[in-house]
Design a protein with these regions (language model features):
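N-terminal signal-anchor transmembrane alpha helix
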Residues: 20-59
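Short aromatic-rich membrane-water interface segments that cap or initiate transmembrane helices
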Residues: 59-62, 93-105, 161-174
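Interfacial helix-loop-helix junctions of multi-pass membrane proteins
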Residues: 41-50, 147-168
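Membrane-interfacial loop-to-transmembrane alpha-helix junctions, especially the N-terminal start
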Residues: 22, 129-142
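Short, Lys/Arg-rich, polar N-terminal cytosolic tail immediately upstream
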Residues: 1-17
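Individual transmembrane alpha-helix segments
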Residues: 74-114
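Hydrophobic cores of alpha-helical transmembrane segments in multi-pass inner/ER membrane proteins
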Residues: 110-116, 172-181
Length: 181
């Protein structure tokens, strides 16, 4: 009987490792997509279109004309509008807003795609021994990446309408560290 029990336990462990491997591989793909979205956001000049940071309440885009006008007015008060996009209309603003919004939304989805399965794996005791702390630290690093992103954007909301290249390098470098882990 102990041999059967050991075999069943080994099969359960093997299955758990498959779940974890599949989850981590999926996360690597999602992080790679995030880096591409970030690059498109940068190349389209969209990164400074959202001048406020609302990590919890900013999940939904403006849903009516009044809200669109509110966020556009905030953008028009920014140095980027005055220096690079003076005269841009609301339709043009919506175009650049999309990429920054999508970048932030994808970040939130990454947090859920990592955090919820991690919680399930922890509760069902399917996390390999010694990895619970590592995975939790990785989740925290992902959240911190959002803070780094805002820190980077904030650097471009000053007199010079351009983000700090050093902060941009930290943001991209952190993304690559997350991908590699």
């Amino acid at each position: 009987m102990p041999a059967v029990s050991a075999r069943l336990s080994a099969n359960a462990t093997s299955q758990s490792q498959k779940y974890v491997a599949f989850w981590l591989f999926g996360m690597a793909i999602l992080v790679a997509i995030m880096v591409v979205i970030g690059g498109v956001t940068r190349l389209t000049g969209s990164g400074l279109s959202m001048v406020e940071w609302r990590p919890l309440m900013g999940t939904l885009p403006p849903l009516n004309a009044a809200e669109w006008q509110r966020v556009f007015d905030l953008y028009r008060a920014s140095p980027e509008y005055d220096q690079l996009n003076y005269g841009m209309d609301l339709a043009g603003f919506k175009g650049i807003f999309f990429w920054e919004y999508f970048h932030r939304l994808w970040g939130r989805l990454l947090g859920l795609a990592f955090g919820l399965p991690l919680l399930v794996l922890l509760l069902t005791r399917r996390v390999p021994p010694g990895y619970a702390g590592r995975f939790t630290a990785l989740l925290c690093l992902g959240g911190f990446q959002g803070v780094i992103g805002w820190w980077m954007v904030k650097s471009g909301l000053t007199e010079v309408a351009s983000v700090s290249q050093y902060r941009l390098a930290v943001h991209l470098g952190t993304a690559l560290v997350i991908f590699s882990l």
